[in-house]
Amino acid sequence: MALLDVCGAPGGQRGDWAVPLAGSRQRSDPGHYGFSLRSPELALPRGMQPTEFFRSLGGNGESKVQIEMAHGTTTLAFKFQHGVIVAVDSRASAGNYIATLKVNKVIEINPYLLGTMSGCAADCLYWERLLAKECRLYYLRNGERISVSAASKLLSNMMCQYRGMGLSMGSMICGWDKKGPGLYYVDENGTRLSGNMFSTGSGNSHAYGVMDSGYRPDLSIEEAYDLGRRAIVHATHRDSYSGGVVNMYHMKEDGWVKVESTDVSDLMHQYREASQ
């Protein structure tokens, strides 16, 4: 309530903070992901959409409270005969400002699962860390690793519960299980897609241009590394919100390995010199 006083929220907005009602279906059994009292939960005023709550802080509506965050990045992943390649840039922007060039946008969920960050960094980190916890609990309960499909479905279910609440996340979940390499795209609306190639972020159209022209399922390992590297470098060259270094991972049958972390400026100079 003190926070509401500081923010100057209207008196009518002072509802109880979100607590499951008596008789609520929310519970903490292993198969339920309702984030009830025994699980991490977002504190929200009951009966109010977060977007409406933030809008109410503007009083007469002239303060223009901005909840649509400006952000940019370039991440990509694709499957080929030797596994999955994940490549990302490392620039983090805050509106029109560059916050840092040293962000690792690949989240290491476990030795056989990787997730990428695109959108709001806080949302991606929070939900994918929560996914890592659920994957670990699955392993402890069942004695085997969770499949890539099931892990992506868990994340999709989490997003569906908070659909329309202002989250911003476009993530790729990749890994290796009994069925081989897997690659899924999940966003803040709960959309879940399986495919051989995905790219997210403000520079994804530039990355797709390179990948579409060079992708083949039968790429060799070095060809796959070069394709992912070139796609990120081209995107950072054309997209002002992407930059820094190329962080590349290779998902193999025995787990992921980090391939390289190379400055995009050095790579661009190398490509220009090679073309002359």
Curated annotation (Swiss-Prot):
Organism for this UniProt entry: Bos taurus (Bovine)
This protein's record includes keyword Cytoplasm: yes
PTM text: Autocleaved. The resulting N-terminal Thr residue of the mature subunit is responsible for the nucleophile proteolytic activity.
Gene designation per UniProt: PSMB8
Regulation: induction: Up-regulated by interferon gamma (at protein level).
GO cellular component terms, A-Z: cytosol; nucleus; proteasome core complex; proteasome core complex, beta-subunit complex; spermatoproteasome complex
Record-given protein name: Proteasome subunit beta type-8
Major subcellular location class: cytoplasm
Propeptide: 1-72
Residues with site note (Cleavage): G72, T73
